[in-house]
Amino acid sequence: MSTPNPPLPEVAPPRVTPRSVLTRLGTLGPLLGLLALAVVATLLNPDFLTASNISNVLTRAAFTGIIAVGMTFVIISGGIDLSVGSLAALIAGSMILIMNSLKGSLGAGVGTILLGMLAALAIGALAGLFHGTTITRGRIEPFIVTLGTLGIYRAVLTYLAQGGAISLDLDIGDRYSPVYYGRLLGIPIPILVFAAVALLGGLILNRTRYGRYVQAIGSNEQVARYAAINVTGVKIATYVLLGVCVGLATILYVPQLGSATPSTGLLWELDAIAAVIIGGTALRGGSGRIWGTVVGAVLLVTIGNVLNLTNIISVYLNAAVTGLVIILVAFFQRGRR
Amino acid sequence: MQAIKRFVLLSAVLAGSASLSQSTPRQVIGVSIPSADHGWTAGVVYHANQAKAALEKKYPNVQIIIKTAKDSTEQANQIQDLATVNKIGALVILPQESAPLTRPVANVKAKGVFVTVVDRGLTDPKAQDAYVAGDNTAFGRVAGEYFVQRLGASGGNVVVLRGIPTVIDNQRVAAFNAAVAKNPKIKVLDAKYGNWNRDDAFKVMQDYLTRFPKIDAVWASDDDMAVGVLRAIQQARRKDIKFVVGGAGMKEMIKKVMDGDQMMPVNVTYPPSMIADAMRLTVESRVTGKPMKATTIIPSVLVTKANAKQFYFPDSPF
């Protein structure tokens, strides 16, 4: 026979039916969403594609993006952290106060700034350690622990600032500002740090034993325990990792405006969580992708940017547009579940 | 018999002490304000505490209780406690929001407490005895008039940053637009929300700079937002922007005006110290028995290099 026997239509084809095509498309959902948004944005305002605008957008995405990379680990392991915005504000305020007080003995030099950065990372790590320990050993829901610290951190910052602003010493600010405003090979430093964090996060999640443990715990904690995985240790480590990410994001944030106020980092936790979820990580844990999170973070910032670059939608409806895009992207991903 | 005697004696003592206290009436004044959650409210808390110290020193029979609330619900509970537990004779309140607090304030007033409302009016003016407020219309108008005068006959392109969608913000922006409309050469390119927040203002200004190749002046409409706007301009290294006007009188910005900063030539007041004025007027009227004016408007004035000194409070957090 010149023609081969047709395969049984009921058995083989389902693997290439629209459903599985949708599934594959679904994985690319956030990326397609971002591309669609970019096309619309360019049609509305050609300035969208200028190098300076793209660099603005990516720099803005760096703050919540770096936090979101850490958040991806926490969410994949089945946890959540609502406190990251407040923590960023507290770290920003504390590191400014520390650097200002160090100026007397160390001057406004690199040493002072490095110690400030170290303090930021340390505070972040300690906060993460506290979250992780209370959640695992104290057996309190992560939602509750971090809801509590969300209030605590911001209140402490507001207290330190007396409700006003904590401002960085001007001399230190001048020395420190290149960390935000500077460029390396023509690329703003926050973008480079964001890229490095994302790359490292991806490697840890997909190429190390630790990353596999995180995914195993998120998909079934009981089974992970039977498999002799140190569930408590791995979980605590995810919160510490996130705390360090928050510290890192704050290190980039402080030189931007040189001040911390009670409205610093407001709602960053929701942006970070939204970026993770848009990126295709399941809120109930078990599986996720770092690159998706990165795209999610950029997507969120782009929506705001596009709305600022155009005038077609009433300013009262900005939040509605953001909400709509989030739901649409999630809709295109639903094939995976 | 013994019991009745004791009872008579006790009531005589009580009556005596009551008449004694009537000769020097002790006044308890409750002050209910939003907690310090951004620069301006931090200034309110600061000035309220300053005024408490000064007034209690001046009038030894006056006791002032200050309560701060993070939202309307908490504030409603607090004024209820002030009336029932602390037995206040007068209440000075800066409501978090107008509508939800109108009923609770009316309830307190119905108990015989004298009520002074500050800044944000209630939806029913019958719930208050006196009203002390900043002038939001003037806040926008004074800034707009400065733009008209400064940009002159040649006019120019102006961008505006709005606060948070509220009645206050609408009044300010409408007054600003009306004032600059007097010069047809001034073009308001766009007005977007910066939420009275440094970070948001930074982003909005960055996007304005991307979108508009030539901007002559910026009305940031608030000093916190002006901080972000200045940084965005600095980062973009744009030289076309001649000046930025914030508002409300943050100490750092008043300092810039004092020092003759080119980018920050003026400021418009919307003083958080209005809470102190309201407290002083209320206490004075309670102590002297003279009625208080039903409405007191604290004017918004233009701060220039010449008069900046009198608006500079270096110790205030705002």
Regions found by a protein language model. Give the residues of each.
Chain A
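Membrane-interfacial amphipathic/re-entrant helices at transmembrane-helix boundaries
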Residues: S2-A68, L102-L115
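Helix-loop-helix "hairpin" substructures at the membrane interface of multi-pass membrane proteins
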Residues: T112-A120, G124-H131, L185-A260
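Membrane-interface helix caps of multi-pass small-molecule transporters
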Residues: F73, L97, A125-G138, V156-L160, ...
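Hydrophobic core segments of alpha-helical transmembrane domains in multi-pass membrane transport
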Residues: P30-L43, M71, A120-G124, L150-V156, ...
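Alpha-helical transmembrane segments within multi-pass membrane transporters and channels
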Residues: K103-T149, G296
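Transmembrane alpha-helical segments in multi-pass inner-membrane proteins
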Residues: V246, Q256-G323
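Transmembrane helix-bundle core of multi-pass membrane transporters
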Residues: P142-R207, V234-I236, Q256-G265, L309
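Single transmembrane alpha-helix segments in multi-pass membrane proteins
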Residues: V39-S105, T133-I140, G280-I290, L324, ...
Chain B
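A residue-level marker of the well-folded mature domains of exported/periplasmic proteins
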Residues: Q22-F318
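Bacterial N-terminal signal peptides that target proteins for export
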Residues: M1-V8
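Bacterial N-terminal signal peptides
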Residues: V8-A18
